[in-house]
Amino acid sequence: MLPPGLSPQALPSLCFCILVLACVVACQQAVPTESPSPQPELASGFWSLVPDNMKALVTRTRDKWQWFWGPEAVQGFVQTYYDDHLKDLSLRSQAWLKSSKDSLLNRAHNLCPRLLCGDGDQN
């Protein structure tokens, strides 16, 4: 059952929006920050700098790409997708169904013997 005020033509775009929103939420969920304690032989020297450098790199990358995961970017993508692919879907579907029905009726009429179906002009 559709929510009040929602037409059946809006259902595909609503499902797509929910799918995009679910992907965004799944990607933004926090990754556990606890890491296993370093092994004693790797705790000194060059390898001891790796966790700090990786944390800084991940933080910088996350900050630079934060705009991409913001609601404006997703909303813009969804709006563009709707405008390009879904806006006139109802009209295109209706036209396709009508042409398919007409084509099917013409083929069926052509297969029907004249004795049973009569001439097409008598309708």
From Swiss-Prot:
The record's subcellular location field reads: Secreted
Signal peptide boundaries: 1-27
The record's principal subcellular location, in a coarse class, is secreted
**Alphabetical UniProt keywords:** Lipid transport, Secreted, Signal, Transport
Record keyword Transport present = yes
What GO CC annotations are associated with the protein? Answer: high-density lipoprotein particle; very-low-density lipoprotein particle
Q: Entry's InterPro entries?
A: APOC4
Give the superkingdom in one word.
Eukaryota
Query: Please, one GO biological process term?
Result: lipid transport
Transmembrane feature ranges: none
Q: Which family does it belong to?
A: Belongs to the apolipoprotein C4 family.
- Function (record text): May participate in lipoprotein metabolism.
What is the protein name stated in its UniProt record?
A: Apolipoprotein C-IV
